[in-house]
Amino acid sequence: MRSWSPYALLVVAAIALDQWIKHLVETGLPFQEKLDLVPFLALFRTYNTGIAFSMFSSFGDTGLVVIAVLVVAFVLYLATRTPSGHVIARTGFALIIGGALGNLIDRAVYGHVIDYILFHTPVWSFAIFNLADAFISVGAALVVFDELIGWRREPSNAKPSKAKPSKD
């Protein structure tokens, strides 16, 4: 259990930061009014009744909560099967779980997810998202990165094969 303590702390910190920022957005940012921070980044409070990019919004609150719980359970399963030396992957799994639970809290409390980050140019804009979504994306990237660098790792306990090559 001790080896999981930093990751559990990261999950709690991700949820707390996500919920705190969403509270600030809900109480201080007008609904669907763009507040430019820099030329390509704005705050824009809106609600997402689906999952990523409003997908599955027709599933309803209960269906989306069930999907989120199943995803968290699956990621927990993967995380527990990850060797302790894979710090990058474990960190990624913790961020995914923290982000998913942050959005799950929104959905359970409000019936929607609070989104507020908008990347844009004068002629284009990206989907509006939140910090929990960013945690999920960064976490997934870390898991993939760990897998990619894992291909280059030599097994530490591998011994040269004593089998003779076949003469075929």
Swiss-Prot record:
**Protein's pathway:** Protein modification; lipoprotein biosynthesis (signal peptide cleavage)
This entry's Enzyme Commission designation comes to 3.4.23.36
Q: Give the UniProt entry's GO cellular component terms.
A: plasma membrane
Q: Which GO terms describe its biological process?
A: proteolysis
Listed NCBIfam families: lspA
In terms of domain of life, where is this protein from? Bacteria
Q: Which cysteines are joined by disulfide bonds?
A: none
Q: Which gene encodes it?
A: lspA
Annotated signal peptide: none
Q: According to its UniProt record, where is this protein located? A: Cell inner membrane
For this protein, the parts annotated as crossing the membrane are 5-25, 37-57, 59-79, 85-105, 125-145
Q: Where is the active site?
A: 115, 133
Keywords, A to Z?
Aspartyl protease, Cell inner membrane, Cell membrane, Hydrolase, Membrane, Protease, Transmembrane, Transmembrane helix
Q: How does it sit in the membrane?
A: Multi-pass membrane protein
Provide the catalytic activity annotation: Release of signal peptides from bacterial membrane prolipoproteins. Hydrolyzes -Xaa-Yaa-Zaa-|-(S,diacylglyceryl)Cys-, in which Xaa is hydrophobic (preferably Leu), and Yaa (Ala or Ser) and Zaa (Gly or Ala) have small, neutral side chains
> Annotated Gene Ontology MF terms?
aspartic-type endopeptidase activity
Q: Name one Pfam family in it.
A: Peptidase_A8
InterPro entries, per this entry?
Peptidase_A8
Record-given protein name? Lipoprotein signal peptidase
Q: What does this protein do?
A: This protein specifically catalyzes the removal of signal peptides from prolipoproteins.
Its family remark reads: Belongs to the peptidase A8 family.
